[in-house]
Amino acid sequence: MKLAIAMEVLSLLLMYILISPMVAMPIYSKIIFHPIPENDDLGDQIINMQTYFHCHFRNITFKALNGESMHGWYFERPSTNKVILVSHGNAGCMEHRLPLLPLLLQTGCSVFMYDYEGFGSSTGSPSMAKICDDATAAFDYVTQKLHVKPENVIVYGESIGCGAASTLSTRRKVGAIILQSPFTSFPQVAADRLVLMRLYPEFVFPEPTLNNLAIMKKEHAPLLLIHGMKDDMLPYRYSERIMAEAMEPKTLVLLPNAGHTDVYKTDVNLSIPALNKFIHCLK
């Protein structure tokens, strides 16, 4: 009987270890990320965007920190020195963020959008560590190859991309931070969505844990939080907590009718003025 109990305890302990984030993160990465190859002909839409916003479009290939090939789009508005660097969410690819571009270009800023490793035309495979490194590589390209001053780069994170944008802000000097539909930290989201994850203390989650809350509780660039109040994937209480505990300067804009994936086109009467005011108040 004692041997049977001991074997059962040992089996449970082994299972606990094997499915822990520290050991099984490669498996969890396949669950978290849902990249889609780039396959649509977007020529007409891009031409229309260039014409309407009087901007120049560049299709860009650059290197990730680990040498993989990354793909980006640069919409340059000659009349500005500010660039919004977009780190998108966990699914699709940047062509699925075309609806976001008018929202950002109307601010008067240039926009640089890119695909993480494994997304769109970018080679490799994604992980939480890699998306942070990819954000860093994109920032370095913008500042070193496009010759944009670091203080003129506004980092924009969408969903899981908020973690990449926030982490980037700890590695490089940035001009401002915009987090759309953020979360407090990956361990917190995991615990909220999977009861099993509540058994694991935060230290067993490998770095980076995409801890937006911890990063914003320290000194940071001007911060704008945007969140849909009907978001059923990442509830807006995450943004409220970040807002409550973050250091100044900080601003929170809640969109009453927006969910998780329609922030670009819902309640734009609130999001557009908020974006414009935030960006135009930057030095």
Regions found by a protein language model. Give the residues of each.
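Catalytic active-site module of serine/aspartate enzymes centered on a nucleophile-bearing elbow/loop
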Residues: 267-283
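Short alpha-helix in the alpha/beta-hydrolase fold that links the catalytic acid
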Residues: 100, 212, 221, 235-244
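Acidic catalytic loop of the alpha/beta-hydrolase fold
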Residues: 230-234, 261-262
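Short beta-strand/loop motif that positions the catalytic acidic residue
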Residues: 218-220, 225-227, 231
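An N-terminal hydrophobic leader/cap segment in hydrolases
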Residues: 9-61
